[in-house]
Each structure stands twice: as structure tokens, then as C-alpha cells.
Amino acid sequence: GAPFTWRSESDEPSPARLHAVNDRLSADTALKRVRNGEFLLYSGDFHNAKQLLGALGRRLERASNARTPLEAFRAERRARQLEHETLSRIVVSLDRDYRLTLTRAPDVALACRQVWGEPETEFTVVPLKQLLGMLGAAEWRRKGLAVPGLTGLIHPHYGVYLPTRTDYIELLLWLPELKGQRVFDVGTGTGVLSFLLLQRGASSVQATDCDARAVACARENAERLGLRKSFQVGEADLFPEGKADLVVCNPPWIPEPPKNRVDRAVFDQDSQLLKRFLEGLPAALAPGGEGLLILSDLAVLLGLRPQGWLQEQFTRCGLTVKWSKSTAARHSKAKDTSDPLHMARSRETTTLYCLTPVAA
């Protein structure tokens, strides 16, 4: 076969061989073949390909006899990982104009250019499941997303954490007057927290993110909202240079290893990012400055973090809680009784901690 560019979100190496399949392939045969390690290059009808993915997903084991929330959580992650690995072996080919060569296929060229730029070779091969995710993301990016308290819409990019959970956003609306404050936003994502703070009176925001896609997304959103003059964003590990009156961070809240790029918004192995944020916070604050940490307690409810762990970290880093405000987590899964983690998620709360350095 001709050389192709392999695109995968989970750093899987390019397949050594692709096996051509078509509409005659049954889901049972497909499952056997992908479990054998084959990558199946689909040619035929787009809707049939989507139906095959759905049928494969339904054939995967989801049963769990977990006895604790943590066992349920780990079983759910393993099942998701297995589903991802299995379904990612159904792949499709795009030509040098990012045309999907299946009958009844939608136009995917814009969605592909938004994520990858121009084609690098004659053919691009991508898991169909990932391409469907990119199409959905392109639609969100086109339509935009309304956020409570924000004037204007957020247009999220593919691979950047979607601000569909409103609990942490609504906590920010509790903040007192921000007039004239210089703000750092660490791990900005779409930029949503920065824009809320600017619309509430902050004079400037310097935002950072470790992912280039988030930086591009936040920059474009600032432009759309007319906030480019007061908003700067750059790729950085944690803090921008200098000091700020207010440093805000909504870090990943589950201390487990991320499995792919998108996971990094939720999973923080051994709480490394959270610990480094708290350790570096005092030095990033101007005199009289405050840190704002927004964190869910799901890790405690799952047994991944002991009760009181966060307070110990504050003390270790020379920080004290000036005030805090909590709210019940509001997201689609909190009410889903079929979710194996329902017990934990229904009790989840998100807290905004206002932190100041302990007086020397």
C-alpha cells in the first residue's frame, strides 16, 4: 500500500498492516479479528461503518461486581480502555483533500484541518471512532456553548476540556469585586474562567496551558469575545512569569494516570500537578494576593485520597484557607443511577478555596 499518515489520539504506533474490509463484514467476525490485533480498513458505506462500531461496542463486557466505589471506578476505566482499544482498530482512509472515501460520507475536511492542519501525505488513516469525535467537536466549535454568567459563547476546540459542568463556573460568580486585579489562570483550557473574571472587572489575565490546542482555543475565544487586549495566553507548564493579585486554577481532580491527551484535564497522576501548583502559589502572588483553587472531592469519595489530605497540602505549602464555598456537583452523571459510580457521584461536591500565604 501507499504510504499514509497515521493519526491517533492515544499515541498508538502506526499499524504495520491494514486489512481491507467492506459492508459484508459481520460484527462478530470483526470482533474476533480486532481481538487478534488486526486493523480493519473499512471501505463501503459510512452508515454501515457507524453501525458496525455500535454493534462492536454492544458486544463488549460491561458487567462489574465491584464491592467498593474504587473497584467500580477502576473496572469502569478498564472497560473504557478496552472499548477504546477495540473500536480504534476500525479505521478509515482520507485522501489528500481529507475526503472520506465511503459512500454517503459527510464532509470531514474542515474538522480534519481544524485538528491536523494540511494533509502531509497522499492518504491519512484514522480510527473511525476518533473521526466521529472530531466531527462532533467541529459542530460544537461552530455553534458555540452558552456558559452561566458569561456574555457571549465559548467555542471549544477538539481535545480541549468542554466546560459543560457548570458547578465550578457558578462558584466563581460568588467572588467579590475584582476591579483592577491582575489575574493568572493556570491550565486555562477554553479560557472560560479568564473571560468570566475579565467580564467581572479584572484588569488583565495572563493564562497558561501545557497543551498547544488549548492555547489556540483560548486565544480564538478571547478574540471572539472582544477581550484580546486584556487577555494573554501562552504554552507553559504552570505559572506565567511575574506575580498576580489573583491566581486561579481548576486542576484535574482524579489522582490516577491519564491514558490519552483528553484525559489530562481530569486525571493527574499522584496529584503531581495539584501539589506543584500549591508549592508554587506563594511565590506567584503579589503582596496581599490570593489563590483560587477549584476542586471536586470525588477522589476522596472514591478512596483515592484520604480525608484531610488537601488540608495537609495547604499546611505543607504555607497556605491558609481564607474562605471556601461549596456546591453539589451538577453534571449529567450525578443523576444517572445506572452509572456504577452513582453512589460517589451523587454525593460529590465542588469547592472554591480562597488561599493566602501564612503570614511569615
Kindly label every feature range from the protein language model.
Residues 288-295:
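Conserved beta-strand signature within the Rossmann-like core of class I S-adenosyl-L-methionine
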Residues 1-9, 15-26, 30-145:
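N-terminal auxiliary segments of SAM/dcSAM-dependent transferases
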Residues 273-287:
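A short glycine-rich, Lys/Arg-flanked "PGG" loop and its adjoining helix->strand segment in the class I
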Residues 107-182, 186-196, 345-347:
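SAM-dependent Rossmann-like transferase core, predominantly class I methyltransferases
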Residues 212, 251-276:
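Mobile active-site "lid"/loop adjacent to the S-adenosyl-L-methionine
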Residues 310-358:
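Class I S-adenosyl-L-methionine
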Residues 165-249, 255, 259:
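Conserved SAM/SAH cofactor-binding pocket of Class I
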Residues 276-277, 302-318:
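Short alpha-helix
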